[in-house]
């Protein structure tokens, strides 16, 4: 394994949700560690769901303690030991998690406690908040504050807005205004995994990313989210086109925040047989070699608590807009773990 880089940016992030093939065989993440020329900084395991029963927390559609996930959790520990930061993803296309966390204080405590217990039990180093249902600004601030208070300054808190939400709160799946959240709790949020796909952004050119920066977003905190294959959603960008976009962003923004990919198991060019090749391709396009994991983790652990801010629970929410393409949630009855993000 190559030595750790002193440069914490750009990040290279992969979501890992489809953890097993249709026959129930584990899709191993170990090649992301053992294969050459991969500089992966973060893995985000998805998707954690808070269900009606507060004690019925699930990873996709099974309890996180299900024997099906035993090897998955072990491999994630190996990834951590190799310097890759491992986060969980809460929410996604399946609704309900954030509605339950956005209720009164007593309800919040009931639903939050099992989530916190899961983070501790599995040694997750952070949580990605993928809010794809209406949530109040006060509700998301309360959640961020509680995570920071419970898990300390080294815990990585990220959010996953659609890219357009960073320009216009009306083009948003989350309800709250991300600019307002950044103004109130920016020091607590490590970065934003902005979705530049499925009709909510375009990575064929650097234009939308540049517009976000012009609007005031720090490029070091703005990660360009991509689909790793056309099978994972509209907006896939061929590598030769993406190379130009990333080169332009790196030249214009020396502290470019990096890229994330949705998701690992079938990414091009290797597809299901060699899914790690997407990370190899991105490592080349980003112009990096060798894992820079420790430097990234050190840079992200500098968040400091911010003073409390009075939140109006009746503050105006962003307008919910329709998802531009059909999303389907596949359960194990369909022999799949897939939950479109």
Features from the language model and the residues they span:
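Short glycine-rich, acidic/polar surface loops and turns
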Residues: 245-249
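Short linear regulatory motifs embedded in intrinsically disordered, acidic Ser/Thr-rich regions
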Residues: 306-313, 323-340
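Functionally critical loop-and-helix segments that line ligand-binding/catalytic clefts
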Residues: 262
